[in-house]
Amino acid sequence: MKTLVLLSALILLAYQVQTDPIQNTDEETNTEEQPGEDDQAVSVSFGGQEGSALHEKLSRDLICLCRNRRCNRGELFYGTCAGPFLRCCRRRR
């Protein structure tokens, strides 16, 4: 089960990397969305003992938020949240 979850996350991540542009021009950077009303934090939980071990490992290394439309710069797509939201994560510094 863990393997299936990790494999599907990697496939979704590869798909997002292919669809996002690699570099932003100065014009695109100026019009980039700022965090605000569209961003909503949603708690995500996994059931069972295996799920909580996976959640614990992810939460140590990543900071994740649920975004309305797309992930911000520096964040990667890690699946979906409740409803139409995208789960976007970045590495903890």
Curated annotation (Swiss-Prot):
Protein keywords: Antibiotic, Antimicrobial, Defensin, Disulfide bond, Secreted, Signal
Domain of life according to the entry: Eukaryota
Disulfide bond is among the record's keywords: yes
Compositional bias of kind Acidic residues: 25-40
InterPro entries listed in its UniProt record: Alpha-defensin, Alpha-defensin_N, Defensin_beta-like
Compartments in which it is found: Secreted
Disulfide cross-links: C64-C89, C66-C81, C71-C88
Main location (coarse class): secreted
Propeptide feature ranges: 20-58
Residues covered by region (Disordered): 22-43
SUPFAM superfamilies: Defensin-like (SSF57392)
Any one GO biological process: defense response to bacterium
Family, similarity comment: Belongs to the alpha-defensin family.
Described purpose of this protein according to its UniProt entry: May have microbicidal activities.
PANTHER family reported for this sequence: ALPHA-DEFENSIN 1, ALPHA-DEFENSIN 1-RELATED
Protein name: Alpha-defensin 21
Gene transcribed to yield this protein: Defa21
